[in-house]
């Protein structure tokens, strides 16, 4: 499944972007470097079971074991001390990245209720795209009966694009369904 998106990039997207942006060298064409999936867990400090469930869930969705992110400093208002677990993150590259993106674009995003497309303004100014998902149930790997609580996650797509326009063109050519404003 991952090979499909990579082949689409090499055979269709690269020539299209070379023509659109008048690149002289094939290495100037933007490509996706990595995808990071992150979930902040405020209740992980008090509830160890939530952390275990999240680790298993993110591993199932991405196909890679996530790393536990810990608090850098103590914040009394949030009742956390330095070193307490506050979330999980996973960085996907190469084959797993393409497999995850393929599932995200073709399976998960269309399953969102009232989905009209993703926000085209969520670029960071350097061609990278960040997308917030409200629930984990949109992924077909997640079994509805196994989850204890609906939690969201952040998905960041890091590209070699220099501008938002190049990044948007790359992701649109890869099949990302952007909302028409």
UniProtKB/Swiss-Prot annotation:
Keyword match Acetylation: no
One cellular component (GO) term of this entry: ribonucleoprotein complex
Q: By what name is this protein known?
A: Large ribosomal subunit protein uL5
Q: Which organism is it from?
A: Thermosynechococcus vestitus (strain NIES-2133 / IAM M-273 / BP-1)
Keyword Heme among UniProt keywords:
no
Record's function text: This is one of the proteins that bind and probably mediate the attachment of the 5S RNA into the large ribosomal subunit, where it forms part of the central protuberance. In the 70S ribosome it contacts protein S13 of the 30S subunit (bridge B1b), connecting the 2 subunits; this bridge is implicated in subunit movement. Contacts the P site tRNA; the 5S rRNA and some of its associated proteins might help stabilize positioning of ribosome-bound tRNAs.
Source domain of life is Bacteria
InterPro entries from the xrefs? Answer: Ribosomal_uL5, Ribosomal_uL5_bac-type, Ribosomal_uL5_C, Ribosomal_uL5_CS, Ribosomal_uL5_dom_sf, Ribosomal_uL5_N
What does the sequence similarity comment in the record state about its family?
Answer: Belongs to the universal ribosomal protein uL5 family.
State the UniProt keywords alphabetically.
Ribonucleoprotein, Ribosomal protein, RNA-binding, rRNA-binding, tRNA-binding
Description of how the protein assembles with itself and partners: Part of the 50S ribosomal subunit; part of the 5S rRNA/L5/L18/L25 subcomplex. Contacts the 5S rRNA and the P site tRNA. Forms a bridge to the 30S subunit in the 70S ribosome.
Q: Name one Pfam family in it.
A: Ribosomal_L5_C
The protein's matches in SUPFAM superfamilies, at most eight in alphabetical order, are given as: RL5-like
Q: Which PANTHER family match?
A: 60S RIBOSOMAL PROTEIN L11-RELATED (PTHR11994)
One GO molecular function term of this record is: rRNA binding
For this entry, list what GO says about its biological process.
translation
